Regions:
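Lipid interaction determinants
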Residues: 2-11, 16-19, 33-186
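Bacterial N-terminal signal peptides
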Residues: 19-31
Length: 186
């Protein structure tokens, strides 16, 4: 009968002894992917439009919190509970690098959308965004969808507030400011 070598007999215990440290290192690496928060919550907020801040946008998820038009008026957003199929009608935006490509996805008030995004020289920009084709012409979310997707296509300035509550600011070509609140789940 063939008897396993000493190295073969010790390999499983060696592998088992590495399992816990490897798991701890993996968890630490995942935690490092989160947007850093400012260590001093009493410090004045930093400039969210600092070009370095937007570089931290990858692998985050956001929900539209407010929309201020260029003239200072607020665009009305749908209530949280008015979406189709129990889905909130308030638009969302998720920015992911899970497959090695910067991908944007979200909910635009009526339909889901997806496409690519880029971060260059402190500017966040979106490639063509494709969406599903549900019809929601009379819903609050449906009325917001076309302007929302148009705003994403015309971002001229982006800012990221890292101090709680974390917020993403997108300023459009026509001067509107969309403010997003951080979502814990994508």
């Amino acid at each position: 009968m063939h008897k396993p070598s000493a190295a073969a007999r010790t390999r499983p215990s060696f592998v088992r002894s590495l399992s816990a440290p490897l798991a701890a290192i993996s968890l630490a690496a995942l935690a490092a992917c989160a947007i850093p928060t400012h260590p001093d919550s009493s410090a004045p907020p930093s400039d969210p439009f600092n070009p370095a801040a937007i570089q931290l946008i990858d692998d985050t998820s956001w929900q539209l919190a407010s929309w201020r038009n260029a003239d200072g008026t607020q665009r009305e957003l749908p209530p949280q509970d008015q979406g189709a199929n129990g889905q909130p009608a308030v638009p969302t935006l998720t920015l992911s690098t899970a497959d090695g490509v910067r991908r944007a996805a979200g909910f635009s008030g009526c339909n889901r959308f997806g496409g690519t995004y880029a971060v260059k020289n402190g500017l966040l920009s979106f490639g063509p965004l494709a969406g599903t084709r549900m019809a929601c012409p009379n819903s609050a979310g449906g009325k917001l969808e076309a302007p929302y997707l148009d705003a994403l296509a015309h971002v001229t300035k982006a800012g990221l507030q890292m101090q709680a509550p974390q917020q993403l600011y997108l300023v459009t070509q026509d001067g509107a400011t969309l403010t997003f609140s951080r979502r814990d789940t994508p």
